[in-house]
Amino acid sequence: MFRIGQGFDVHQLVEGRPLIIGGITIPYEKGLLGHSDADVLLHTIADACLGAVGEGDIGKHFPDTDPEFKDADSFKLLRHVWMIVKEKGYTLGNLDCTIIAQKPKMAPYIEDMRARIAEGLEAEISQINVKATTTEKLGFTGRAEGIAAQASVLLQKV
């Protein structure tokens, strides 16, 4: 049996915060605003995994009203989500992600992101795809006001 999930997330770029995407800190003058570390890609992946097993979304599991998750490491949140997936008897088929950002360029960091995500999902790097695109300077991502991400996951019953 297979299950498919999809995720989407957006965070605003602001000064005074580190930029963490896919579990990797990227040197940039701005970072993403959020209750946790605001890792837009890991949040998207967590949502896709939760959706695939019918467990809602990260807001349900890690509410932004709970002080326990203030500045939380999104990699730890992803690991918790993956434990839920495993408890339900699933393993990763593959994951395909897209980061939508005008700036900074993501290409130099994608392989490190793939490795970190594979670690979090107990998978091979070959099961993880991360790509990046711009919106050709259109919309909030095009104006570099924020970063968005999308993910599709295929889970397989063990």
Curated annotation (Swiss-Prot):
Pfam families: YgbB. 4-CDP-2-C-methyl-D-erythritol 2-phosphate binds at residues 9-11, 35-36, 57-59, 62-66, 101-107, 133-136, 140, 143. Keywords: Isoprene biosynthesis, Lyase, Metal-binding. GO terms for molecular function: 2-C-methyl-D-erythritol 2,4-cyclodiphosphate synthase activity; metal ion binding. NCBIfam families: ispF. Involved in the biosynthesis of isopentenyl diphosphate (IPP) and dimethylallyl diphosphate (DMAPP), two major building blocks of isoprenoid compounds. Catalyzes the conversion of 4-diphosphocytidyl-2-C-methyl-D-erythritol 2-phosphate (CDP-ME2P) to 2-C-methyl-D-erythritol 2,4-cyclodiphosphate (ME-CPP) with a corresponding release of cytidine 5-monophosphate (CMP). Belongs to the IspF family. This is 2-C-methyl-D-erythritol 2,4-cyclodiphosphate synthase. It comes from Bacillus licheniformis (strain ATCC 14580 / DSM 13 / JCM 2505 / CCUG 7422 / NBRC 12200 / NCIMB 9375 / NCTC 10341 / NRRL NRS-1264 / Gibson 46).
